[in-house]
Amino acid sequence: MKWLKSNVFVPVLAFVFVMFFWATAFAASDEIRIGVIGPMKFIQGKSQWNGAVMAAEEINAKGGVKVGSKMMKIKLIQADSNEFLSITDATNAMERLITRDKVHFVVGGFRTEAVFAMQDIACQNKVIFIGCGAASDELCNRVAKYYDQYKYFFRGTPFNSTALVKAAFSHVGSTAEVLRNELGITGPIKVAFVAEKAQWADAMVPAVQATLPKMGMELVGVWRPSPVATDVSAELSAIQRSGAQIIFTFFSSSVGIPFARQANELKIPAMQVGINVEAQKAEFWQATRGQGNYVITSSTYARNVECNELTKPFVEAYIKRFGEVPTYTTGTYESIKMSLVDTIEMIGTLDPDKIVATLENRVYKTPPSTIMYVKDNLGRHTHDLKFGPGYATGIASQWQDGEFVGVWPNKWKPAPGVEVTYKGVKPIKIPPWMIKAYKK
């Protein structure tokens, strides 16, 4: 009897294992595995995950992705890069996605220093990686210089640092015009430049030094706090003494919260304008204890502002799903749904080389913009985004009494005979303590 049980049990067990692995392999063959990599304990990574989840839910609800004659569902694999604190952790997270999880594609990445390493790993393994957070021009310059090696990388969001600078200067210029018109300031507007000490912001210092005087403004100083500083009172005291009327910010990390809060607590008579990624989130109001009022930041979305006909439906659906306005790192949504999936369905394959050859030549609409990938001045593909009217411009938004409202582009004139205003933008508001200090 023991012999019988043993001889029956072993084949049955073997059969079960075979069926399990066969079923697993079959299921995997019907899935498109997409890695979502980012700092998942922080707002930036959470937004990357939310955008990906929303895209996958919409795609799978319609039956999945049509790959030739086959329908395949999207499966997301989350990877916490911990890249704010460790580039090594970010590198390991990307390695695991590719070698252990066998992903077909990756979206995400945030801190430039970490994304360079992620880019190397993805491209070495011929895995298409759409960056949804890092702005460095060099990420796409690599594509142009070493195309065969780096062609698997595309920028999804934001547009590059050079374009971010152009947009930010436009926001500063619009704010300066409001100050001149409403406060009667006649001399050069005094500007303090404050950028977190990070690689992506380094090129901004010489750009600010060269550009502000041409805009009729005076640079009164440059400050470079840590991206994760919790106390910036020393910097703010110096800025207050400088007499700055605009504080031009470049923050992608958590320093944006204490800076905004402490500046308003001190009632510094100056407008905060520039990039403050933390200010793009609904939690910013609570995080600053209501002291984030009047902060202006470059952004991608604000409720009721429409860049095109796709913007409002996406924003409202996102708010319904997650209870907040999306930020730019939710660009994982369009990177999956419109960049990858639409291209896959066009050509009927997951072959990365064929996807690259098609995607790099596409022009297509997404909720925040129209995507076109530019070539460099030698005619080489860069897989970088075209910036300007009709393409990617972003918006600027301001916190006004607890509401995050779009304020730019509002009669923006990027070229002679061209004026751009997006539906839903509102006028910029000046803090009352600044009005009191300057208006006679």
Residue map of PLM features:
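Bacterial N-terminal signal peptides that target proteins for export
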Residues: 1-13
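Bacterial N-terminal signal peptides
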Residues: 11-22
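Beta-alpha junction/loop-to-helix N-cap segments that form part of ligand/metal-binding clefts
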Residues: 31, 43-50, 65-144, 156, ...
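Extracytoplasmic "Venus flytrap"
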Residues: 35-54, 79-87, 110-111, 194-203, ...
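Short, polar/charged alpha-helical segment
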Residues: 45-67, 206-214
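Extracytoplasmic ligand/sensor domains, especially the bilobed periplasmic-binding protein
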Residues: 103-222, 271-297, 304
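Extracellular/periplasmic periplasmic-binding protein-like sensory domains
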Residues: 136, 140, 158-161, 263-335, ...
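Segments of small-molecule ligand-sensing domains
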Residues: 320-327, 341-414
